[in-house]
Amino acid sequence: MDRATFACSTAFFHDYSSSAQGTFSTGHVDFIDKIESFTYSDFFRDYLIPNQPCVFSEKFTDGWGSRRNWVTWGGKPDFDHLLQEFGEAIVPVANCDVKEYNSNPKEQLPFKEYISYWKEYIKNGYRSSRGCLYLKDWHLSRAFPEQDVYTTPVYFSSDWLNEYWDAIAVDDYRFVYMGPKGSWTPFHADVFRSYSWSANICGRKKWLLYPPGQEDYLKDCHGNLPFDVTAPGLQDRSVYPRYNQSQPPVEIVQEAGEIVFIPSGWHHQVYNLEDTISINHNWVNGCNVAIMWCFLQDELAAVQREINEWKDPMDDWHLQCQLIMKSCTGIDYKEFYNFLKVIAENRISILENGLDDEASAKNTPKAAISTLGMLHAVFDLKRTVKVLTSLSANEDFKKLDLTSLSPPQEALLHHLKAAIDTALL
């Protein structure tokens, strides 16, 4: 991050609401063609800060192993190579033809069985008695770390979600998707209202994107979001009373090799127009961590409303709300504190101790922080201070047993502010 971008980002987040998700006044999505003329600061300033979508050309993925090895000369999935590398893996597969609790039910299948199904599905004219099956949310990089699959583009390298979950060795938010023509993902916004990027290794996708706030017009009379935003039933004003106030979606057709950047809080629906393989990351950083925090507060409030009748007779009602929230979203307030702590401590370490040559040569969070520069670390700490201050003042957070937090939030905040002041001297 250069000084001009640091000044721009500091001014933006000082002047605007911490939960601002940006506006989108046109239907045009920028196409980034040339690597050599597009810098990290360009992306940060023009897309991350204002929370706007864009598409990167296939030039940004030309060197990836998956594009060389997973695809035939004709641009189709190379089933033989994939079977050779991953045939015995167990993978999550969704049935696109079945709706279950506003999503598609999943099962675990051997990868070789899924590929056999896919080949038969193509042979039968894209029909099967088993329905349209879509391999989704496969943690391939975690299961096969030795594979030369891809390199995360520098534009997406400030990735707090995967930095934290890698540190605690529990989970990650790096996925591979594989599916036949006609497979699709229902209407949704991404986990924690995170950013996402999605790279097509082969095939084509159609994206329908709705800027933050537009989803409110798509809710039914009970406040529920639709499963499919293209369904004719949305025209029924007795069920969807505000649908006619919604704007048409922003539509993107993504070609092979291209990367789509989906901003924070944008709801979307996605179709595979051909047999398609893609790589996806969900990620959070200093630009959208406040949006994540607002989402968590909204999620907790929804849980509290659901079990409000038990508030008086239940001694540990606030704790139960946190447990339910974590089961639904994957995180609670105390883990969110630990998330902020890990991010903060990694940056404090860089600012206070620098980075030795051996560490910078490795693929580690500290190396990524160093690559983005000291001013980026300061920006991250400033955003962490903002959100951590809000968390510490939150009444629901203060009702929890915080004695297990190490260090206590007051001490962490003091350390953060001191590190920022020293770095800016």
Curated annotation (Swiss-Prot):
It comes from the Eukaryota. It catalyses: L-lysyl-[protein] + 2-oxoglutarate + O2 = 4-hydroxy-L-lysyl-[protein] + succinate + CO2. Its cofactor is Fe(2+). Transmembrane segments: none annotated. InterPro entries: Cupin_8, JmjC_dom, JMJD6_ArgDemeth/LysHydrox. Its EC number is 1.14.11.-. Residues 141-300 form the JmjC domain. Keywords: Cytoplasm, Dioxygenase, Iron, Metal-binding, Oxidoreductase. Fe cation binds at residues 188, 190, 268. Catalyzes the 2-oxoglutarate and iron-dependent C4-lysyl hydroxylation of ETF1 at 'Lys-63' thereby promoting the translational termination efficiency of ETF1. Belongs to the JMJD6 family. GO terms for biological process: positive regulation of translational termination; protein hydroxylation. It comes from Gallus gallus. This is 2-oxoglutarate and iron-dependent oxygenase JMJD4. One of its GO terms (cellular component) is cytoplasm. It is found in: Cytoplasm. The keyword Transcription does not apply. One of its GO terms (molecular function) is sequence-specific DNA binding.
